[in-house]
Structure formats: structure tokens, C-alpha cells
Amino acid sequence: MSLAHTAAEYMLSDALLPDRRGPRLKGLRLELPLDRIVKFVAVGSPLLLMSLAFAQEFSSGSPISCFSPSNFSIRQAAYVDSSCWDSLLHHKQDGPGQDKMKSLWPHKALPYSLLALALLMYLPVLLWQYAAVPALSSDLLFIISELDKSYNRSIRLVQHMLKIRQKSSDPYVFWNELEKARKERYFEFPLLERYLACKQRSHSLVATYLLRNSLLLIFTSATYLYLGHFHLDVFFQEEFSCSIKTGLLSDETHVPNLITCRLTSLSIFQIVSLSSVAIYTILVPVIIYNLTRLCRWDKRLLSVYEMLPAFDLLSRKMLGCPINDLNVILLFLRANISELISFSWLSVLCVLKDTTTQKHNIDTVVDFMTLLAGLEPSKPKHLTNSACDEHP
């Protein structure tokens, strides 16, 4: 065996990817990076603001401070604070004998409304986890495995071709067999391509993804409506008039009709309201961007894997409308690019292919590795001319 053939075999052996068996791909990302950010912000920010509201309530004691009459004892003043906080009604005299009441319940419901908002924003995440993640996980495991295996099969094919070339004494026989194999598509492995083509006709994943982001937009709009309708109405009201002349106290003459109270937690209420509006206003463009990514193909990822035999979705113009499961899978393949060991090898081969296309007819990794192994990717011209001379 010559030194060149030995070097070619070593080079091809090094190009083979390690066989990953057993518990593998444990770090598979089943959420896109931007979706994960949206989830943490949309769910985490209400919980953070809720903890801020509770912390203020625990640190300052009573959330309101009522100006009770001077003849009230400490226990009576505490009763006034408790009664006014329980009712949280603002009494306003519109005219003689006309008493108009306005509820200030958003102040009391602030922590619980934030908890409800966090749970509401977590519903799309649960939908994705239970409706899409199981199928997506199996799809990614199969496709990643097949992409790496297809690359390895291509390298092993070149190794086999090199051995045949070494054993063949007649170069005509080798090149005739090689051309026959190419014409009959022996070098192609259509299982993966057909599976991806089937995913173009499937829409379960993309429907779940669209529903997830649409629900986020709907819940965000509902949050705006809630804040605008309920919080804005009491946003600047720091003081209110409270009436405790109810029940047994309704006939007590020494009890004033209205007692002025001040909301000590108004600043926290305002901070929470403004923060919620700002946070979800920032999230809306991110959610819309996530949806727009479904309107275009990740052609760079596809172009790299065009180096594999039978993976010609781009060259054969098999890509149609991008709103299907295949596009969602491609987005997650891009997010899990670290699991695709073959991607780095094929990216290098794509760069090298661009520098040699003027000299050689290189279409796949088989052609390029054949060239690197010291074999011509196509029949040499002197053999072609000799064959033409023999068969004029």
C-alpha cells in the first residue's frame, strides 16, 4: 500500500463522526431562545412585581392610613382603618343628598391580579409542552441522527471507493461502475429527504407554535385593557373618603359621615402598573418577530446540508410555503446546532467547495472527499478520450 493511499485512509477515518449511542442529546433545546426569553419575562415579571407588592405591605403595615377623629381611641382608629380597607369605597357628594361611590378594589387585588397574570401567561407554555414537545423531540432526535449518519455513510462510501480503486487493475472498470452507480442513484439515501418532504405537508407543530404566540398576544392585549380600564381610573387617587356609618354605627351621632383616608401603597401601585405596561410593550415586537420567522426558510442551514447525497430540497426547488412543520423543525435544528456534529464539517467543506468549483464538478461531500482522497470526482479526460477512440 502506497503512502498516499495510507494518508487518504487516515484522513477519511478522521472525518468520520463518533458514534453516539446510549443516553444522548439530553441537552436538546425544545424551546427557541427568544421563546425562552419571552416565557421568563412574561411569567417572571408579574411574580417579581407581586413580591414587591407583598414586601411593601409587610414592611409598612397597613396599606392605608385614615384620619380618624381625635376623640377616637387607638382601637377605634384601628377599626376605622380595617373597615375602610375592607370596603375600599370612595364616597363623593355630587349634589345635595346625592352620594356617588367609586370602588378602589384594584389596590386590594393588585398582588392577586399579578399572580393571575403570571398563571395566564404560563398557559401558552403548557400548551407547547404538552401539545408539541413530545412530537418535536422525536422529530429532532431522528433528523439529527440521520443527518450525522448520512454524513458518515458518505465518508464510508468514499472509503469503499478508495479500496475498490486500489484493488482494481483496470481503471475503465472502476469509472464505468462509478458512473453507473451515479446514474442509478446508488449514492443517495432518500429516507431523510422523504421524511422532511412529509413534514412539509404536516401542520401540527406550526399550528401549535402559532397558537402559542397568538395566545401571548391576546393575553397581552387583555392585560392592556385591564390596566387601562381599572388601574388608570384610580392611578392618581391617593386620598378617598370612607364611610363607616353602617350597621350598628349608622345611628351614632359622634361618628362623622365621612373619614378621609390615604393610600400609603399608591407609589407601589403606580410602579407596578407602569412596569407592566413597559414590559409587555417590549415583549410584543419580540412575539411578532417570532411569528414572522415562520414566513421564511433558513436556507443557510439547508444549503450546508445540500452537500449530502439526496438532500437537495433547495436545488430541486422542493420548498413551497414556509408555514409548515418542516420550517419549525429547521428553526429548532438551528437552535440545536451544537448537537449537529456534521454541521461544522459540512460548513468547512462548503467553504472549500466554493474555492474549487471552477476546476472540478463537485456537488456532494462524496465528490469532495473523493478529491481529497486523491481520486478524481469524475472520469479523467484521457480515459474519456480513449473510450471515444475505441468506440467512434
Curated annotation (Swiss-Prot):
Extracellular side, ranges: 61-113, 237-267
Taxonomic superkingdom: Eukaryota
Alphabetic keyword roster: Cell junction, Cell membrane, Endoplasmic reticulum, Gap junction, Glycoprotein, Ion channel, Ion transport, Membrane, Transmembrane, Transmembrane helix, Transport
Reactions the enzyme catalyzes: Ca(2+)(in) = Ca(2+)(out); ATP(in) = ATP(out)
Residues carrying sugar: N71
GO CC list: endoplasmic reticulum membrane; gap junction; plasma membrane
Coiled coil: none
Cytoplasmic topological segments: 1-39, 135-215, 289-392
Function of the protein: Regulator of osteoblast differentiation by functionning as a Ca(2+) channel in the endoplasmic reticulum which regulates calmodulin (CaM) pathways. Allows ATP release into the extracellular space and activation or purinergic receptors.
UniProt entry tagged with the keyword Amino-acid biosynthesis: no
Full protein name: Pannexin-3
Entry GO MF terms: calcium channel activity; gap junction hemi-channel activity; structural molecule activity; wide pore channel activity
Organism encoding this protein: Homo sapiens
Subcellular location: Cell membrane; Cell junction, Gap junction; Endoplasmic reticulum membrane
Presence of the UniProt keyword Ion transport in the record: yes
Family assignment from sequence similarity: Belongs to the pannexin family.
Oligomeric and partner information: Homoheptameric.
Lineage: Eukaryota, Metazoa, Chordata, Craniata, Vertebrata
Spans through the membrane: 40-60, 114-134, 216-236, 268-288
Any one of the GO BP annotations: monoatomic cation transport
Topology class, membrane: Multi-pass membrane protein
